[in-house]
Structure formats: C-alpha cells, structure tokens
Amino acid sequence: MNQHTNLLGALIALATLSTGALAADFQVQGPDGKPLPLVMVTRAPSQPAVTDTSDNGYAPTGKLQQGTFEFTGFTDLGGRVHLPDAPGDYRVRLRKPGFKDHWIEPALLAKATSWRMEAETDLKALAEQRPSNAWTSTLLAGRDDLRKEFMAQCGFCHQQGSSFLRRERSAEDWDSTIKRMVRYGARLSTEAQKELPALLEAHWKDIAAHPEKVPAGTPWSPALSAASVTELPIGDRFSQMHDFIQHSNGMVYVGDNLQDRLYEVNPQTGAYTVYRVPPQPGDNLGGLLAGRLKDFPKHETYQGIHSLAESAKDGHIFITPSYQRRLIEFDPKTKTFSNHEIGSGFYPHTVRIDDKDRVWFTLALSNQIGMYDRTANKFTTYDLPFRSFMEKLTVKLTPFFFKLIGWGVPVTNWVKIDHVSTGVPLPYGIDITPDGKVWIARLHTDEIASLDPATGEITMFATPLKNPRRLRTDRDGNLWIGMFSESAVLRFEPKTAKFTTFHLPVQPVGSDTPYALNVDRKRHQLWVNGTNSDGVHRLDIATGQWTHFPLPRKATFTRDVEFTPDGQVLLSSASFPSWHIEDAQPTLIRLNPNARK
C-alpha cells in the first residue's frame, strides 16, 4: 500500500467479516495511527429492493412488498463502529466533515484490506459538504426581517440552501420561480417578491465566487457514537412522505401527500403494504385546488392526505385530506377507508384525538378549528378571531378563490400580499393538553390559542417570536412550540401564561427552521425537526442539555416526529419535491440514540 505521510486522512481497517452477510467491526485511524472518532459509516444495498411498481410507478393496493434497510453508525472514541448482520451485497460510505466521501464496493468489503479517506481541501467542495442552514445563514445580511420572511415563506416545502436552490440563477429566473411558488401557496409579500430576485441573483453569484464565505455546520457530538440510524426507502422522487404515526399495533403509517397513498410499514422487517386512498365521485385531480399543481410533473392528488392520528378506542386512523372538505377514516384491521364530509371549512390540516374520542383538527384556510364527535357523528367548527375586517372578508371569499384556482386562474399572483399575510392567518398545528383543552398555533399571526371544549371559549396568546408552526404538550401540561423562522422553540406554561425561549443548538447560530417537534413524555425529552440542518435535535427537559443528531442524506427535510415504545425516534424525509433529497429517495427514518448502550 502506498504511504502518504503528508495526506491528512483516515485509515479504515476491516476487523471482522462473516460469510454471506455483512457483520463488521471497523476501526478508523488517523495518519498518526490514533483512533479517529465520529466518522459516519453508512451501509446501503448495492441494488435497490425490487418491488412491484405496476400501479403508475407504485405498489398495487394491498400487495405486500419487501424493502431493504440502510444502516448508519458512527465511530466511537476508539475509532470503532459495528455494522450488524444483513444479507445480500452492500456498499459502505464513509462520511466526515472535512474529508472526501469514500465508497467501499462489495468486492473490497470481502477482503481484509484498508481504505483511506482523503482530506478535502478544495474550498468549493468543502462548502458543498455543509448543510442547507450553513448556506442560508449567508443570506440577506443586515436584513433580518426580510430573511425571516423569506425563510418562513420559501423554506416550508424544501430547503433553500440545497444544491438545487443555491445555484446561480438570473433575476428573471428567480422572478419566475417565485411566481410559481406563490401559486403553490407561499405568502411572500408583494414587496419581497419584487425585491428578492435581484438580491438572490447577486448573492448566489457572490457565494459561487467565494465559497469560503459558507461557514461550517454544527459540530458532531461524541454522543453520536452511541447512536444508529436505519432508513427504509419508500416512494419515489415524485412522492412527499408528509406525516406519519407510530400505531399501537406496531406498524408505522406514512402518508404520501402527492400520490394519495398510505404506507403500512413494519419497522422491524422493512415489509410494507401500500393502500391507495380512493377518490370520491366528483373529486377532481388536485381536489378543490385543481390548478395548484398544474406545473408538477406527476401527481395523483385528489385529496392530499396530510396529518394522521390514532383513536385509542378502536385503533382507527383519522387522516386530514387538505384538498377536500372531509375527514378520512382508515381501519387497519379491515384495510378499508371511510369518509366523513365536513360540509364547511377549508384545508383540514393537523389532527389530534382527545380522551373522549373526539377528532380535533385545524382548518387552515378558513381560520377555524374543527371537531368530529364520533359518538354523535357530528361536526362542529369554531371560528378564530380575525385581525381586521379585510382579513375576515378575504377568508369569507375563500370558496370563490378556490374556484378560480381550480380553473387555473393565477389569482394568488394578482392579489397584494403584505408582510403579515393579512387574509391568511393560517391556524396550523394542534394538540390537546392533559386537562382536555385544545391548543393551536396560528402561523401568520404569531399567536397560539386555547379552546375550552366545555364552553367553546377561545383565548389568544401572542408569541414573543415569529411563525409558530406545530406544537406539542409535555407530561406536565406545558406546550412546546416550534418557531419556524427563529431557529428556536418556545415553552408555554398555561398556568402562568409564561413563555420561555430555547434556541436550537445549531451552527451558525439562528440558522435552522424547526417545522415540528414532539415530546417523549416517558423520558421527558423534546425532539425537534432540524428541517434546514439535515438533522434532529434533542432537548433533555430536566437538564436543559441539547444534542444534535445529523442524518445520513443531504437535504433531509423532515416535518414530523414520532417515537417507538422503546424510545427510538421516527422521522420521514418529506421534501417537496423529493428529488431535492440526496439520491432523490424519500425514506422512513428510525434513529436509535442508544444503540450501543
């Protein structure tokens, strides 16, 4: 073997290898022979799993498929990592900031040999290693309000710092792109729409010429050596695996928002079954917003399945279809869908179920909270307050606007939008505290609200930070709220109406966009989506200690968090579009923070 004493790198030695399956212990050494910790070691199949894709590129309804897991571990302080048994041929990728990615092919994995990770010295390549938040931290220096508005309105479908977005474009190209995104639903102010194209053209041209301006991302913690990440590829580049739930039956149910398909996944074996959500008579492609996705190359969105919740009474799953005025109910035992027509309201969004088996959900575009009483088979809607008469009028005209959008009229490009999105207050996340009260976050008004189901009384609370998106309650009845454009979460104590700010543990400071979060009540831990940082963040509530966990794929845009009974963390890569994800493959992600303990 060639010896390059002046090459900063890592020597990877294969210690053991079983026959017919890859069960290996790796040791990572530096050029001085000392152990090298915190190398991300990812094992992936040489070839993707062969599945039946005869239903327009997807598995036929009800037909069992067998996926193949990808496994990632991190080397410990001794430079070691263990890859558990797995049949078949695999490749291994070595990744560490500051080094070139290195792939080890199956033929080399069968030999007791050595590999070297070369140090990366090219400034452009070093910048390209860094996650989206490092790139977006360079945007709009000195224009904090504009930067937050841009990230809030242009960073909720996909990352703005991925390789697809940070490339050089002309102002004309940016103008065209922004107009299309506004048709998709972005509420970027009219002033920002006019100002940003030239600013973005100049900025990304400057960064392309000076990649050294892109700062380093969040340092990797020694805690990673205990962690593992398992990914199961599902769907394709045209899917959007938006939300999911860990069901009491042990399965994970994932909704493909763009293809109206529900995935039933066995997280232990990788076997899964797809159930196509059937459109109802009279449903149009695109639902009530038929013209919204006219430019998208492939979708089967009649309903737009969005958020999921399980009934503790019978295990049925309730799904919000954002492009219709209904709730969908799925019976995991009979594998059948039933529909409940709301009859009013627009854009059913996030859903939760209370202890009385009432289904609560936000109606994002009609400024309402909805409730479905399963026992009485009755819907009730609760109107949230408006900020002005003009906003009330705009919301009341929503049915008319929907018709225009359905006809393909670009009405969203014609109306004037102010900096606070008057007309679209957007009630978004929802949860229920242990005392039975319903809480929502209203994204564009910087407020949360409580609803007392016993009286119907609604109380609004202004948040000290901008853009509350999703919220969850902990075991003490406190609320945790992701503040999307602020790289922070708020804790709200209902008893005292006190807010406390917790900044996310990212570098550069203030650069992440927490789309959602969830509380592991048993372990008293908060887990937050690092939507812009290719990671997930854990806060130990008792100690206040944060830990950042990087994920294996670049452009991993996550929108939800769930937990397995043994404390593993579930996520899904849910970028819209999914072709922004590294290798254009969405996955169901299972993070075990204590795999080696």
Describe the function of each predicted region.
Residues 25-37, 56:
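Structural motif
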Residues 266-270, 331-335, 373-377, 452-456, ...:
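Short loop/turn segments that connect beta-strands within beta-propeller blades
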Residues 91-105:
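A short, solvent-exposed loop/turn motif at the edges and junctions
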Residues 47-84:
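Short, acidic Ser/Thr/Gly-rich low-complexity loop/linker segments typical of extracellular
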Residues 251-254, 316-319, 358-361, 437-440, ...:
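Conserved beta-propeller blade signature
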Residues 551, 558-597:
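Blade-level signature of beta-propeller repeat domains, shared across WD40, Kelch, NHL, RCC1
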Residues 150-161, 196:
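The canonical Cys-X-X-Cys-His
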Residues 237-248, 281-312, 344-356, 388-434, ...:
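Beta-rich, blade/repeat-based domains predominating
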